[in-house]
Amino acid sequence: TAPPDASKMGDWGVFPWLYNTDDATFAFLDDVLNEVMDIFPSTFIHIGGDEAIKDQWKASPKIQAKIKELELKDEHALQSWFIQRVGKTLEERGRRLIGWDEILEGGLAPNATVMSWRGIDGAIAAAKQGHDTVLSPHPVLYFDNRQSASAEEPTGRGHISSLKDVYAF
């Protein structure tokens, strides 16, 4: 069960709220990630990092002061700093961070792997910087999408991703 301030909102999508950059935030994330790593032996831990709307950070005097304190260029650089901080927790346990291609914006953690959902450009950019990449472009490689229009097809989201489409990629 999630604590009330971290409970599910009842819907999914892109939301404008980003994590605070306080030490308490990282303590919470460290606890969650350590529990995940205790349960799952995978070398890679996917932390997301996509669709992080920066409006809340731009409007926050506290966050702007943090950007200045850390001598960062902008909110993208702050997201990079944030993700690198999370990556340190993973590295301490011998794990590797993997995140969506938006983590390229602002700079990557040294051992980060990029999972490129917006096409091949993010994968190419990450590879040119010496990072491992995984191609997972939307919609063709989203395997939670429906695979046919058949009435027997289980409910899925978004477009139909047929076997032919996947193999053609």
How should these model regions be labeled?
Residues 22-44, 51, 65-169:
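Substrate-binding groove of N-acetylhexosamine-processing glycoside hydrolases
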Residues 1-24, 55-76:
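Aromatic- and acidic-residue-enriched carbohydrate-binding clefts of CAZyme catalytic domains
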